[in-house]
Amino acid sequence: MPRVLIEEDYAARRNEILDIARKLVYTKGYEQMSIQDILDEMKISKGAFYHYFDSKPALLEALVDRLADEAEAKFIPLLNDPALPALEKLCRYFSSAVQWKATQKDYMLALLRIWYSDENALTRQKVFAIMLQRIAPSFTSVIQQGVQEGTLCTSFPDQATEISLYLILGLGDKFGEIILGHEAGAVQLSAEERFQIMQKAVAAYTDALERVLGASAGSIQVMDDASIRVWVD
């Protein structure tokens, strides 16, 4: 069989396993899902599974990586659109990312519940490093464009990109902390109280982002109130 066909067959089979795993994360939860569940669904042997993934954590990493692939394909073209000014690129990027996550809220929440467990700390760090590598070039180009247009002001576009992406990650961590704390009963807050905490977090991180990029106050919107409520309700 030609090498191209072998590679296509391998990719197709691997994606089939990921499709089943994603479904099981929805229906059973990652912690309850076993490799045997996947074998039973696909009618394959354990050896066949390990041909594609060497462990359950490797499967989780692949699920997140595929989600990152989807995000990259959807959002990088926005950052690279030559017809848009820099600030509009940033605002559209944030708005589209927020809407995209909201459309698959249940899956995001299922991943969130396992993503912040201690045993996945290394995987989390690794995936963020990969995301930084993927997004950074386009993000830096937008910052450089904004500096040329006079809407952004920084002498360090590369470093500003890294700091900006860490701020975005930090905001996501804050949301995760609030959501998971509420689910676990560790934080007894009303929906309105959670909304207000998230609202303040968005305002604070947005302010920090504008300062890092040298943007005027109120020129960047990371997340609106309606989108925040999606994660409170």
Question: Where are the model-predicted features located?
Answer:
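Short coil/turn segments at alpha/beta junctions that flank glycine-rich nucleotide-binding fingerprints
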Residues: 27-31, 82, 104, 149
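C-terminal peripheral helix-coil segments that are non-catalytic and often amphipathic
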Residues: 133-149, 167, 173-233
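Short secondary-structure transition hinges
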Residues: 103-140, 144, 148-151, 157-161, ...
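Hydrophobic alpha-helical connector segments
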Residues: 62, 66, 77-107, 158-164, ...
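Amphipathic, non-transmembrane alpha-helical scaffold segments
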Residues: 10, 64, 68, 124-136, ...
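Helical hydrophobic small-molecule/effector-binding pocket
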Residues: 88-116, 133-140, 168-176, 211, ...
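Helix-turn-helix
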Residues: 16, 24-58, 62-66
